[in-house]
């Protein structure tokens, strides 16, 4: 577990990671050989190129708005919404505005 998160304290995932102009930054929250939980912040217009998910994954939009390309179709997502990837699903992410998300991935 990441040391930035203290036991017995209330926190907001979206506040653990700042935005940086022109950049995408991420923070591992927790991981082991079977799962990975990461938060990411995207400056407006930045994104991840298409790649395949190594395992099933859930996206939790924490702040702002983004677009997820999944298997050839675009899906708009905003804070409070979620999205699922199947293992091997080809996808990309782009920030429409400054955008933060959490990713929970089950590793095979």
Which residue ranges define each predicted feature?
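Conserved short histidine dyad/triad with adjacent acidic residue
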Residues: 23, 36-53
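Short, conserved beta-strand element in jelly-roll/cupin
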Residues: 41-43, 54-68
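Ligand-binding loop in jelly-roll beta-barrel domains
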Residues: 87-108
